[in-house]
Amino acid sequence: MTVLAAVLALACVPGAFAAPFFNRAELRDAVDECLSVAPFDGVACCATADCGPAGTDEMQTWDVSQVTDMSELFRDKGQFNADISAWDTSQVTNMGKMFNRAAAFNQDIGSWNTAQVTDMGYMFRYAAAYNYAIT
């Protein structure tokens, strides 16, 4: 195995270089960067995009447990359809317009803890494919 191959293999180990996100701005920047490389699911961004605190982790495994505002996070990401059901949303208070115009998004996020959320306004506006319940 070459040194480059070893580095790339390590780079794709979930959590190898990851840290939690602490605010909406750094999470939104990482989403934008990741989806510029892999607009459908955020999987191929592993080892190719600089996703801030997530390092090279795939979007599905990002630690978002400290983020309180996810408003407009996937707004206008029309092709996005990643399984982000494992995200810890227990601290989130704002999900307003989170999937606004994310036309392809249709993943089951019903297990998300939304007890702290006070704003879900237009959360799924123009998210035509979405067909699950959340509580």
Regions found by a protein language model. Give the residues of each.
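Negatively charged
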Residues: L8-T135
